[in-house]
Amino acid sequence: MKIRFVQPLFVLFIFSVLVYADDSWMLYDDTEVDVVEITIDPEDLDWIYDNVESDSLHPAVVHYSNEWFDETIDSVGFRLRGNTSRTSAKKSFKLDFNHFVPGRDFYGMEKINLNGEANDPSIIRSKLCWDLFHDIGVISSRATHIAVYINGDYYGLYISVEHVDDEFLAKNYVDDGGNLWKCLWPADLTYRGDDPEDYHPYYDEERPYNLKTNEDEYDYSQLARLIEIINQTPDETFPDSLEAVFHVEEVLKYFAMNVLVGGWDDYWFLMNNYYLYHEPNEDRFHWIPFDYDNSFGVDWFSIDWTATNPYEFPIIDGGPRTLAERLMDNNQYRDLYSHFLQYFLENVYPLSFWENHIDTLYSLIYPWAEIDVYRTLDYGFTLDDFTQSYSSEHYENQHVKRGIREFVNLRVNSFTGVLQYTGAPPIVYDIVWEPKNPQPEDSIHVTISAFGSNSVENVIIHYYDAPIPDYTEYPMEFNPVPNTKLVEESDRWTGTIPPLGSGMTGYFEIYVEDGNGQGAVFPRHEKITLQTPGVPTDELAINEFLAK
């Protein structure tokens, strides 16, 4: 369940100014292929290629051009990036704009990832995944195609993927000062003990849980707490405890989209490739997707990813995936997950919703793919492989078992009769209110998203005037956004709490009831607090009386 705190109007105004001042969108515009020309000392480049596991940064001059700008930047850090791609002939690179010039960024970005996509003859699979995640409102990296030149030579068509770091956090979260962990294999979120040090990197110097912000404090206590709750909490208190520290709806959407795109290089199958961000202002974790070149029919395990069971996704080692298992074992979460899958299958994922986007990107990148010699070096992919990767007919070459359109059509058809609902009580999975810090005369506008497999028939705000134990009821109305790809907008209910008056403290919660009369109250773990500034009206009256 997501509880989003909305700032007062004057803070919202400041925040909106900051958003509009962020020019990073110009780096991720799909209207043309960007061009980056990197000039580096040839001896440095040779050293980088001779030491592929090194993360040493070397100075380079970068000329970056697209529809919006044409600029040259000196003293940019340059190195290889990635895991298995380091040994590929078509390598992936990282540009670091503030390593040699501290504090510098480039159109709001301190770092840019240039991914070679050596596994993918289409050079588009990960880009399509990022676009789908953005369509459904999951906070994730932006991506665009880019032509890479090094010392005058064309190194091929790449995908520029937004780096997840403190700049990413600042663009996407109200409070960007929290701990961010990069989670790589074998990041299975299993319990190792109560001591936060039990979760310090233990497989190697960085894996599986690598703290990427606030490294000086090196505090793993929040992560240890989350993992303990996932693994040690009894079933009867599991939802209350988990929702108090974690945005459950985010990981359910992540699971649903991964199942649809065949994204197996993830937590559920491979205990790999995700970020966890602890946002301090709400003391809760966010789930951030990562790395999607292995999708849409790319397979190394002889598994038909168009036909996997969405409730029992394959697990490479047969080991525990406690988070996924416990979410699927809880009927409310299982039904919400099924609802997300059904909504995406009806409103987002079928080709009718995004085939034109695929066609546009294909036409845009074809000339650059045609002259990309490096894309042929690792697996011998030809231009025909590039073209057939977009086919709705059967295509197969080595680890690429399906064309993209073929995969999508088969995956959609595979869900016929598969989704099942348990009839669990309804759930409220998103709560938004504004203003967060109301003035005495402000009404508080509440928006929630709720789902029940037996329909949601009644939603009521329960408002408590502190310290009075009784509540006042304010009804909410079903108010969905038509033709939206955001499931939470389709499940939207709205209501209003009248002005509280001066110096008041109150609390509210949401009561939701389905067509079978099953009811529940959210948030489960605590009511939401509202406060207004000033002196309470009754105290003011007494003071005035005494003054007379």
Report residues per predicted region.
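Bacterial N-terminal signal peptides
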Residues: P8-S16
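Conserved NTP-binding catalytic cores of kinases and kinase-like/nucleotidyltransferase enzymes
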Residues: D22-L128, I448-G452
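Internal "kinase-insert"/substrate-recognition segments embedded within catalytic cores
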Residues: K94-P102, M109, G116-E117, I136-S141, ...
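Extracellular acidic, Ser/Thr/Pro-rich low-complexity tracts
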Residues: N437-Q439, V446-S455, D465-P467, V512-D514
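Aromatic- and glycine-rich beta-strand/loop motifs that create alpha-glucan
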Residues: V459-S502, G515-G519
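A structural motif detector for short, solvent-exposed N-terminal "entry" segments of globular domains
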Residues: Q531-K548
